Structures are given as C-alpha cells and as structure tokens.
C-alpha cells in the first residue's frame, strides 16, 4: 500500500497526468484519509522517512492524514503515535534534516495537536521531552542540530498556542474547558522551565543571528504571557534583552507586539500601574529618538515607517492600559496622570507623523481619553487640549504631495481619516467650548483671509473651508450651549455669518483654480443658505452667488466632477432661496448664458466588464438645469409676463426643433439613438415644467398656460409618431404628470379651457392604450397616472365623461393581463410574478382613488355597471390570496371602501360629495351580496388558510383590516348585519354563547378595542381554548 500511496500522490500532484488517472488517484487518496488502514500505512511511511528520504509532496500528504486522524485514535494508539512522533523529531534533529518551512510547520502542528491529547493523562512529560531535545542551556551557534531542535521547539509551542490559547478562534464549551485544564497543567508542571528556556534563547549570544528563532520566541512570550505568571517575565535581564531588540531592524516589529501583549495582561489596577512604571517604556522609546527623527526627516525609509506604526501601536496600548486602570480605580488618578504626562509627547509626535498610517494607530487611545475626559475633567488641562486641537487641525490638511484630484481612492482614504480627526475635534469642542471658539476662527482667518492671493496654497484654503463648515455644525449642534432664542444673536453665529459674507465677497475663490476649493465653496454656500435669506440686506449676496454659479467656476467648470455637482447645487440654491428676480437684464443674461448647457445630446448606454448596463452622457444631471430654468422663470414677477414668455420660448424652441428632427426621420431609419434623443427631449420638457410648478400657490398667467398647452401638443405629436416605444410612452406620462398641476390651476380659474384639457388627456389615453406592446409594469404606471387625473380633475365634467367611457375597457384589459399565463422564458417568471402583484396593487390603488375622490358613481353608470360585479369579485379574489400579503391587506381596505359607499342604502350610492350620483339608480342586491361575501372572507381567511399566523406582523395587519371591515359594515347595516353574521357563525359550529359574545362586542366596542378583541378571538379559536 505504501507504494500505491506514493504513486497516487505523484499522479495527483502531476500537471501532465491523464485526467481519468488523476481522478482515480484523488479517489484513492480520499479513501486513505478516511480509513484506519490508510492511517497506519501513512504512519509507517513517516517512521521510515526518519531514516530514508521521501519527496516533499508525499511527506506533506502523510502529515495531513495523521493530522486528520488524531482525534479518532484510541488512547493506546495516541500513546504509540506520540512515541513515533518523538522518534521522528529526534531523527530529524540528529540528521539535521532541513525540511521546507511548510513541512516543519505541519509537523509542529501535528505535535501540538498530539500534545492536547496526551499531556494530562497519557504523557505528562511531553514538554519536558521537548526541552530535553533542544538542550537550550548548552546551545551554540556552531551546532546546527541544536538550532534545528530549537526551531522545531518554537514552532510546536506556537502550534500549542493555536490549539489552546488563541482567543480569536471560536471553540465549543467542551474544548474551552479542556484548554483550561491544559493551561492549569502547564502552569503546575512546566511553566517555570518553559519561561526559562525562552529567556535562555533570547539572551544566548549564540542565537544573535538566528532571526527566525528569535522572532518565534518573542511571539511565544507574547502568546503565553496572558495566562502565565507575569513575575517570570519581568526580571531585569529579560526586560533589558527584549528592549535591546527594539534596536534590531529585523526583530523590532515583533518586539513591539510582544511588549503590547505583556502590558495587555489582565491584572489588578495597582499591579498594572506598577508594571507600566517598572517597564518605563515611554522613556525607553524616547531614548530611540524616533519622534525627533520624524520631524527632521521627510524621506523616512519604508522599514522606519513600518516600525513607527508598531511603536505607535505600543504607545497607544500604554495609554489605553493607563485609562483602563483609571476606569477601574478612580483613586489612582494622580499616578495615572503622572504617567500620561510622560506619554503625551510621544502620542502627539505620532499624531504629527508624516504618514497617516502611523498617526491613526494612536486613535483608539485618543478616543478613549476624550470619552473618559467627559466623565473626569481632571484628566486634562486646557493647555493639553489646546495643543491636541492644534495637532488635529494641522493633520487635517491635505499632504503636499496630494493634488486632491488624481487618485480618488487616496482621497477617499484621507477624507475618512480626516473624519476621525474631526470627531476628536468635536469632542474637544464639547469639553472646552471657549477654547474651541477662540482657536477655530483664528485658523479660518489665517487659512482663507490672510492668504496671499498671488501665492496661495489650495491646501491651506481648503483646510479653512473645512473648518468653516465644521464651525457651523458646532453652532447647529449647540456646542456652545446657547439658548435657542439667542443663537442668531450669539457670538459664534455672528462670527460664522461674518466669515460667510466675507468669503462670498472675496476674490480668493475666483482666483484659485482647484476643484476641491470650488466644490467645497458651493457645498458650503448651499448648506448655509438660511444665513443668507435671514436678512433682506443679503439679497445682493445672493445675486453675486448666482453670478459665481454661472461663471467658469461653477456650471461651466472645466472639471467634470465639479461641473456636474454644481448643476445640482445651483438647483438646490435657487429652490431654497427663491430670490425675487425683477432685474430683466440679469435674468435674461443668466438664461442666455446657460443655453449651451441645455443642448441635449443623447448617448446610448453601454455594458461594463461585468455585463452591467452603464448609462452614458450627463442627461440625468442636466435635468437639474432644466428644472432650475423652470423655477427661475416662475420666480419672475407676473408684471414681467413678456419676459416669462420669451424665456420659455427660448428654452422650449430648441427642444421642439430636436423633436421635429426625430419625427422627420422615417420609422424604418430610426436608430435607437433617435428614440433616446426624443425621450430625453420629452423628459426635459416635463422637467422644466416641474421646476415652474415648484412655486406653489402661483396663479399661472394665461400666456404661460398657453405655452404649456403648446408643449402638450408637441408631446402628443411625438407620442403619436413613437407610440410603439416604451421609453417614449414613459416620457409622455412623465411630462403630462407635470403639466397637470398647471392645467388644473387654469381649469379652476378658467372653465373655457376645460374642453382643451380633456381633449389632450383623451388623446394621450387613447394613444397609449392602443399600443399593442404594453408591458405589465406600464399598466401599473398608467393606472397611477390615471389616479392623478382622478384626483386633480374630480369636479371636471369633461374629464368625468372621459373616465366614464374608459373605465370598463380599462378594467377588462387589466384583468385579462393578470389572467394571462406566464409563457415567457422560465428565468423571467419571478419578474413577471412581481410585476403582476404590482399591477394588482396599482389596480386597487386606482379603485381607492376613485372612491376617495368621490367618483364612485363612475362604477355604476350605465356604461360601467355591468363591470362592477367583476371588479368587486377580483377585489375579493385578491383578498384571499396570501401569497402577497401586502396586496391582500390593500384589497381588504378597498372592500371597506365599497362597504362605505355601496353597503348601507339599499344599493344606492352613499356619498354626498359625489355630485354625479344623484340621478343614478340603485344597484339591486349589492347590500346582500357584500354582506355574505364579507362575512365569508372575514372568517375563512384567518381560519381556513393554514399560513395565517398572527405571530407574523403581516398577517396581524390583515386581521386588523378585517376587523375594520366588519365594524364598518356593522355601522352601516346595524342589526341586519348582526343577524346574518350570527346565523353564519352558528352554522359554522360556534356555540350560542360565543356567537352572542362576538356580536355583542362588534356592536358595543369602538374600532380600536374591537381590533384588539378580534385578534384575541382568532388566537383563542385557533388554539382551541
């Protein structure tokens, strides 16, 4: 079998072996791993390997098999294996067998695992035998066998740590308990000798050049110190030796980690303080002069920076341990402060380091210190906070080698780094608001306003803008603890307002051609618009800001990122400030200046390397400009009506020309880009009108309404010519949804235009509805659009007639679409089911829109009353369907609406606000129909549907809606409903007492209490109690 194993491993590792043969080899290998016969064969191979050479691949496989079988062995087998492993180890050492690192690690891992099996009950001399093998006290650098022995020794101890001491590995309680017993046994039997051996290795000059052994030994000290006796580790000889490694470039990083592990050991506060005082690490690190070197050397070598990161981690841990001492024993404040006083220069030096990776390693200490300072102000002095604040602010500045543009990842990392610094600054502001109030304005003033414009550093100005923005946040968060009524007259508020005004009036921003400055300026202005609108005297500042926005600094910026962002910010600024624009020349110049930005150029989307659709072009952002144009024109006083009309034409006409070009292209020659261009043009029209409508309460001028009417005609002509394209239908609905508020306003004030509006909508509905390729999602959007029409024109006779003619074909088509089976690609099935559920909800919402806007008469006119039973039937059907609980709940809500308008007056529509209902005859039998169907639904749904579980919030909501439905009917029909309900419950087998109780509660309880009762009733009946 040994030969077979050898061959199988060779084939498995071969890159040229026949695939079939390779599969057979893997099957054989897996068989070997899982059988006792295979395990024994591998042990035999291992025994022979101590005397004869085998290849590395086979040896690693043998190690794997043994490793995977150790936990399955009997005690006798474990004992035997232990003997063989030690024989192998002894042979490797005596023969100086220099296996590759991965083989040595694997063998050490096996020994570590074996240790866990044998140390307590089977072979307590495990560690003693290891120590005897290495004979560290007689080790010399000229004895290679001894070096190999110690190498294996350190690897085995690292493996043992992984098995019993690594706190980052999750273990079962059983293994956790076993590990505690192993640690106890080590402490009792071998701890003293183990620690002595480590000290001997570290202090033996023979190993001075054996870096891997020393590194591993330092790691071991750090790993084991957490659960061993600390006194064994802190002899002067040991400490001095460890400290000396801080000056060894190959060992110093590990040394820092070891020292962190030593000082992190859990112990009583007083003992921890004594340990830190004894080690006196801060003073020793100071002797290395690392901080001063950083100040004077801008060209640190990489390894020096890496070492400084470890030193920073060590200093951070010292600080955190001191703070933990204070948290656990507040009486030690004086001693803690004394040690912190010695620590702060090194901490501040790390914070001030040229490399952010070094600085952020002391962040945990700073966070802990500032948090604790809130509870314990004696922990700091104002001078310390002042120094720390200055260091934090200086560190927030962009590095001199960062241009702030090229590398977005680097910039994102820095902004995240700066955000952490800012959180520390904010805490200092809370602790010492007066210090903050004195320091920050000085920084802002020096950074922005005392800068030589001809020799300006953008990084300095950017820091000033950042601090100015942060200063306003401090005011908003009331860091200065000022009464709300006095904030606007407070010193901080006035300082900020003065800075903001000074910034706007300054030429500095205009002269610094850097994206960060330009972008931050506009963000700052828009964020603090309320400082500008709070006073009439600031109107000139707003005008100046408009001019800056429309300069090459903003909307026309050469940097695309700044340019695109400024389009949105310009829109936000106009919308928030709503300036009174009565200067014709200024307004016209702004609009004319912006015209080049309003040229629409469609670009087809592409796919990226992941096959995802990527939108091209800037049209989505460009829409902010169109919306802004609409808003600007709406802000022009009505006295300047000619200017309004002129500017609307100025913006609309290029779009109309674009649409005319698109329409003129024969359908057979229309490329996708033509359709997209037409879509963008329609979207732009709708977006501009949406901007105009932002000024709520406006009375729209007849000339303006006429312009919108003309735009509506252009949109409809475009739709006629592109009716088969979904994106054109979508854009048309989008545009008309924005026209409606203006048409409605004019409709309310000018009845002669009613017919024109209804004609537009009639044509729109007809064209869209006649399209043969409508998607399910489009039906949902269309119903939502119709709901908007119902709401806005509920009193318009022409619109009523339009809807009356359309209701029946609408519902018939919708129900047909929902009834159609899924015939498309099976992969599309989830999407189609989702879209159909959305359409059901859209249908229910449309019904709700009809009822809630007092147009229920539409459902019972001569044209539509034949469809009413089908509509009500579908609503009941959706109520019963619990595969989509949201739809079910919504359907029950609509049943309540039906009950309220049809369920109480003998079939006569019961809605006094429905002006069209009076001349309509009652619907015979609808009362009885609804009563029976509602009662059936109310009890079949919770009691016959197995999935109906009141522990699920969705089903609980449905139950509450059923309670509302029952209560609504009871309020409508009173005793008549109670009688039918009582008979139903008795027929279903409910006792007379329970039936009486239910009907009595339905009659007597208010809605809130009946909902609770109904939930309780369902729970009680379903549990059988």
From Swiss-Prot:
It comes from the Eukaryota. GO terms for biological process: tRNA processing; tRNA re-export from nucleus. Its main location: nucleus. Keywords: Cytoplasm, Nucleus, RNA-binding, Transport, tRNA processing, tRNA-binding. GO terms for cellular component: cytoplasm; nuclear matrix; nuclear pore. It is found in: Nucleus; Cytoplasm. Coiled coil: none annotated. InterPro entries: ARM-like, ARM-type_fold, Exportin-1/Importin-b-like, Exportin-T_C, XPOT. Transmembrane segments: none annotated. One of its GO terms (molecular function) is small GTPase binding. Belongs to the exportin family. tRNA nucleus export receptor which facilitates tRNA translocation across the nuclear pore complex. Involved in pre-tRNA splicing, probably by affecting the interaction of pre-tRNA with splicing endonuclease. This is Exportin-T. The gene is LOS1.
